[in-house]
A protein has these predicted regions:
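Membrane-anchoring hydrophobic segments
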Residues: 1-87
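FNR/FR-type flavoprotein reductase catalytic core
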Residues: 5-15, 60, 73-93, 98-187, ...
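Membrane-interface capping segments at transmembrane-helix boundaries
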Residues: 25-26, 185-195
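Intrinsically disordered, low-complexity segments enriched in polar/charged residues with Gly/Pro
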Residues: 31-33, 38, 50, 54-57, ...
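Ferredoxin-reductase
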Residues: 190-277, 322, 327-329, 340, ...
Length: 442
């Protein structure tokens, strides 16, 4: 799954549109200052687009692709906004003869400075993934405040065109869209489109907890493999959290999600949930779905959830499918009995359980040994990121095209590859340091 080309094209075009009018403004002016002005405009456009993606409006996935990839673009737009703002501040954008500075102009300059340093702090918190999620989530909402300050800076700062000129109207319109998006995400949750559900049954599935939900009113329509954002305000879990739906769509609109104790949020949720707990559900989201033709599904741990739903929706014309379920031991495998029943009923579904406590960790060689030739096969994966990355590299050696390796990124908050950079620097500087120590005199 990837960001849609139309979304990338729309983003690029939105950034380049100001260049349509800049040539007519540049004449006789400082080119470096004009470049700084352009950087400031692209920063505003990036922030507005980032705010729009954060709304999770249904059209967002249609334009930018599945929500997991849209959020990745959301992150990089934020980083570009910071970089462009920093360069805009560093490169002098002041021009002579633009008019007299007033108190409002001074306030706009101050707003721009506050916005820059605020963004710098918040982006640093975002990429420093060792900072607890709940603290990041609390600070992240202030990015919208700094966008408001940036828009104020743009509207009232002295510039070589007016807000009523075509360029001024364009950037102002983009800012307005971003401000509407920020207002929408800041509004009370009950104003946002969602469906009301009640918990009807809680079932232990190995180490996981299967939560069955019944609709109160109009039910949610979804496809097998999709996920939702769900919150439980009555038990103090009001922050929406993404969960994959672990059952195929039902005619009566009932849903099931399966929770594993993988973090502070899920542990608290498993303790607090009871039957009749009220829930609000937003979605569905995602484009993880049954592929066409022969396919291999690889699940690790609670990563079985989308495949449990997809197995339930599997038709006789689909596949054939080989489902490899990697779990420490069968006793803690969620939905195993259910999957075995489906595999027994459908000749086009083959279930292979790999117990890592006895058979060792799953790797690309083990997958290839189970499935055979991977050319022309689609591989769908759900599970921990390290195993995903290892399989993505290893399966290529067994003939799998990278375009046929499908997964979703459930890391709503991600860094910028600092771990890989540090690993590279460690590998590079270690031998260099050793050589320097040997070459230096005692």
């Amino acid at each position: 799954m990837a960001v849609r080309k139309i979304g990338l094209a729309a983003t690029g075009i939105a950034m380049l549109v100001p260049l349509l009018w800049l040539p007519g403004i540049v004449a006789g002016r400082d080119m470096l200052a004009m470049f700084s002005q352009y950087l400031g405009m692209t920063a505003l456009i990036a922030m507005a687009l980032s705010q729009t993606i954060a709304t999770r409006w249904p059209s967002i996935e249609q334009i930018f692709g599945p929500l997991d990839q849209s959020y990745r673009l959301h992150k990089w737009l934020g980083l570009w906004a910071l970089a462009a703002s920093f360069l805009h501040d560093t490169i002098d954008a002041d021009m002579r003869g633009l008019g007299r500075e007033t108190l409002l102009v001074g306030a706009a300059e101050t707003a721009g400075e506050i916005s820059l340093y605020g963004l710098l702090i918040l982006v640093a918190i975002t990429v420093a993934t060792f900072i607890p999620y709940h603290l990041w989530k609390w600070t992240h909402r202030f990015i919208g405040v700094f966008f408001v300050l940036s828009a104020f800076h743009y509207l009232f700062i002295l510039k070589p065109f007016s807000n009523g000129d075509p360029l001024g109207l364009y950037v102002g319109l983009v800012c307005l869209i971003g401000l509407v998006a920020y207002g929408y995400t800041s509004a009370p949750r009950w104003l946002r489109p969602s469906r009301d559900y009640n918990v009807t049954k809680l079932e232990r599935e190995g180490e996981a907890l299967a939560v069955h939900l019944a609709p109160v009113g109009r039910p949610l329509k979804h496809r097998a493999g999709q996920f939702v954002f769900i919150n439980f305000p009555d038990i103090g879990m009001g922050e929406p959290h993404p969960f994959t739906l672990s059952a195929a769509p039902q005619e009566d609109g009932r849903l099931r999600m399966s929770i594993a104790p993988l973090g502070d949020y899920t542990v608290r949720l498993m303790r607090r949930l009871t039957e009749a707990t009220a829930a609000r559900v937003e979605g569905p989201f995602g484009d993880f779905k049954i592929a066409r033709g022969p396919q291999v599904w690889v699940a690790a741990g609670i990563g079985i959830t989308p495949f449990a739903a997809m197995a339930g929706a599997l038709g006789p014309e689909d596949g054939p499918v080989t489902l490899i379920y990697s779990v420490r031991e069968r006793a803690i495998a969620a939905h195993l009995a259910e999957l075995e029943a489906v595999a027994e009923r459908l000749p086009n579904l083959r279930l292979v359980v790999r117990e890592t406590s006895r058979q060792g960790r799953l790797d690309a060689d083990a997958v290839a040994a189970i499935t055979g030739d991977l050319k022309g096969v689609h591989v769908l994966y759900c599970g921990p990121a390290p195993l995903r990355d290892a399989l993505g590299v290893g399966l290529r050696k067994h003939g799998l095209s990278p375009r046929r390796f499908h997964y979703e990124l459930f890391e709503i908050r991600t860094g910028i590859g600092m771990k890989r950079l540090l690993e590279y620097l460690t590998k590079t500087t270690g031998p260099l340091r050793d050589r320097l120590e040997k070459a230096s005199p005692l």
